Regions:
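Conserved CoA-thioester-binding segment of acyl-CoA-metabolizing enzymes
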Residues: 1-57, 294-304
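C-terminal alpha-helix plus adjacent terminal tail
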Residues: 1-11, 73, 180-181, 212-304
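Terminal peptide-recognition signature
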Residues: 17, 21, 35-36, 54, ...
Length: 304
């Protein structure tokens, strides 16, 4: 496979999978999920690779699903004659081959540990993807959240539920409030937050330590933990969440909102959504990620 929207780079025992649409905040487009799953499989099959690092190029990890153009780029999967088809949407989101969550979960299923490195914006589907990694380390000023809680979507990977206790899971599910990397670490959503200047070195240091452990040992420990969460109903929660997500993308309110994004602009739609809360697009500069914090492609960093 030739990668269009990700970058795959191996440095010794580490495989870097980098979301590579920096001009668009690495928002998710149809090829990205196929390429992600393929790259994870490539790292799994490479016996020299011990650890996978997932990151985003440019100013952000991932700005969520790309819905410019009214989400029509997904019509091949969810529409008939240009109109939303509930049956096709249901088939798409619940299929192991085409569903968004099963492709995110290639990170979870990988026998090799996955470290997700988060900076900038990590929202919506981008946060669902990030949290499927085993260990998540973020910059302190990263902004992580699920704005779809307010309009046009629903939890589908379940990680926001399983990583948090009931109180925070409910609060963030109902408000869609963004949390900084620092707060995400404090509430246990992610493992650690560090200043951006230390982020890449922090991730590399942990990856090198994990790479010193036999791969079979890591695989067995990961499998035991994963199985415990499967026993708690993770897969059924994901199936239910995916179906709910397909419905909530197509309520009258959601359709009016996505039409506003198509007719006026994505910026106008998210401003309407976020205005009462004063976050995401409407946050003050102090509550937004520093736009100067940029992650290069691994090959560029090594060359530099």
């Amino acid at each position: 496979m030739t990668y269009q929207v990700i970058d795959y780079y191996v440095d010794g025992a580490l495989a870097y999978i980098t979301l590579n649409r920096p001009a668009d905040l690495n928002t998710i487009v149809p090829p990205m999920l196929d390429e992600l799953e393929h790259a994870v499989g490539k790292a799994i099959r490479d016996r020299a690779v011990k650890v996978i690092i997932l990151q985003g190029a440019g100013r952000s990890f991932c700005g969520g699903f790309n819905f410019s153009g009214g989400f029509t780029q997904w019509n091949d999967e969810i529409a008939t004659d240009g109109e939303w088809d509930a049956g096709r949407d249901l088939m798409m989101v619940t299929s192991q081959e085409t569903g968004w969550v099963p492709r995110f979960m290639s990170l979870w299923r990988s026998p090799k540990p996955v470290i997700t490195q988060v900076h900038g914006w990590c929202v919506g589907g981008g946060s669902e993807m990030a949290l499927c990694g085993d260990i998540v380390i973020a910059s302190e000023d990263a902004q992580i959240g699920t704005p779809y809680a307010r309009m046009w979507g629903c939890h589908h990977a379940g990680m926001w539920v399983y990583r948090l206790g009931l109180a925070k899971a409910k609060e963030l599910a109902l408000t869609g409030r963004a949390v900084s990397g620092r707060e995400a670490a404090e509430i246990g959503l992610i493992n650690k937050a560090v200043p951006f200047a230390k982020l890449q070195d922090e991730v590399r240091s942990l990856a090198d330590k994990l790479a010193s452990i036999p791969s079979s040992q890591l695989a067995c420990m990961k499998l035991v933990v994963n199985q415990a969460y499967d026993n708690m109903g993770l897969s059924t929660t994901q199936m239910f969440g995916s179906v709910m997500d397909s419905m909530m993308r197509n309520t009258p309110e959601a359709l009016r909102w996505i039409e506003k994004a198509n007719r006026e602009s994505v910026q106008a739609a998210v401003a309407e959504r976020d205005g009462p809360f004063g976050d995401y697009s409407q946050a003050t500069p102090a509550n937004k990620p520093n736009p100067a914090n940029v992650v290069p492609l691994p090959s560029q960093r090594k060359a530099g």
